[in-house]
């Protein structure tokens, strides 16, 4: 009889664990743990501007939140929310699929590429690029010119799409084969040349994929990748650090450049790669499935502090 009772108890414990009736169950009465990117982040800029809290895009003072978690990259945000059942943050839509997080409906609209293109999902921003206004040698300048042309081809656009970039690939877009003869540098051996890429961590995966593919089309040119945030884009190509040891030949930003103030880039040296969206995200165990602009503002300004005020 004792053996039967013991086996029954063990079975009940096991079943309870499978059913989630332990203390691992999501408790909506728990405190909300808020995460944000650092103040130099383009994703942060796009998020707070998008929800109508633009005063917080470069300043933590408007965020009246105890225990605010600040992370330095898209990857750090993903890891933080994956390890915090009660956390909420925001990431690039291009990173959502492989993140292991739940992307919340925003203003009742699912975060999908289709909904971005049709204009119903509105928490969006551009992925932008900037190049140097002058180079250390003509070869680098010619390689960058060829790379910019590659971005407008069917192959380049398809790669951006495959990495989560939102844009149309048209049959009228040129193929690389149809334009490569215009860029003689690509037919040379460029294996002793290194192009320095950097900037936004949200754009890093896309930029690396584009560089890997273009290297094969451009005489095996090398690319060095160093991504620490959108603020590096102007600073290390045309700004204060353009001649430092950490200079960049081409850089990427997940926000628009401040052309009328601190980032007065030379005309013709910057542009847009594609559209991206920003997605509010929570842990998979969180029962919240959608969020509004007003709710996000109230969370990040300390008005809402418990999950049961949202769910």
Model region roles, listed by residue range:
Residues 16-20:
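C-terminal motif of bacterial Sec signal peptides marking the signal peptidase cleavage site
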Residues 21-311:
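Exported/periplasmic ABC-transporter solute-binding proteins
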Residues 11-15:
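Alpha-helical transmembrane segments
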Residues 1-8:
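Bacterial N-terminal signal peptides that target proteins for export
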């Amino acid at each position: 009889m004792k053996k039967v009772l013991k086996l029954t108890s063990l079975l009940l414990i096991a079943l309870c664990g499978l059913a989630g009736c332990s203390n691992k169950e999501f408790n909506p009465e728990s405190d909300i743990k808020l995460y944000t990117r650092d103040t130099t982040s383009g994703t942060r800029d796009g998020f707070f501007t998008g929800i109508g809290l633009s005063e917080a895009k470069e300043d933590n003072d408007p965020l009246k939140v105890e225990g605010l978690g600040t992370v330095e990259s898209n990857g750090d945000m993903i890891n933080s929310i994956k390890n915090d059942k009660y956390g909420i943050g925001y990431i690039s839509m291009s990173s959502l699929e492989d993140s292991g997080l739940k992307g919340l409906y925003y203003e009742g609209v699912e975060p999908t590429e289709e909904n971005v293109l049709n204009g119903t999902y509105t928490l969006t921003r551009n992925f932008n690029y900037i190049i140097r206004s002058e180079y250390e040698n003509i070869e680098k300048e010619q390689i960058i010119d060829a790379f910019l042309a590659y971005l407008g081809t069917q192959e380049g656009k398809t790669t951006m799409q495959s990495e989560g970039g939102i844009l149309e690939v048209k049959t009228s877009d040129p193929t690389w084969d149809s334009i490569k003869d215009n860029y003689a540098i690509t037919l040379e051996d460029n294996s002793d040349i290194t192009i320095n890429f950097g900037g936004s961590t949200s754009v890093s995966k896309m930029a690396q994929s584009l560089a890997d593919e273009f290297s094969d089309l451009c005489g095996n040119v090398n690319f060095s990748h160093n991504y620490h945030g959108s603020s590096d884009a102007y600073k290390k190509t045309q700004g204060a650090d353009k001649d430092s040891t950490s200079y960049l030949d081409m850089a990427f930003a997940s926000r628009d450049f401040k052309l009328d103030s601190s980032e007065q880039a030379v005309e013709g040296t910057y542009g847009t790669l594609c559209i991206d969206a920003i997605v509010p995200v929570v842990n998979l165990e969180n029962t919240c499935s959608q969020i509004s602009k007003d709710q996000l503002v109230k969370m990040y300004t300390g008005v809402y502090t418990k999950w049961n005020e949202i769910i």
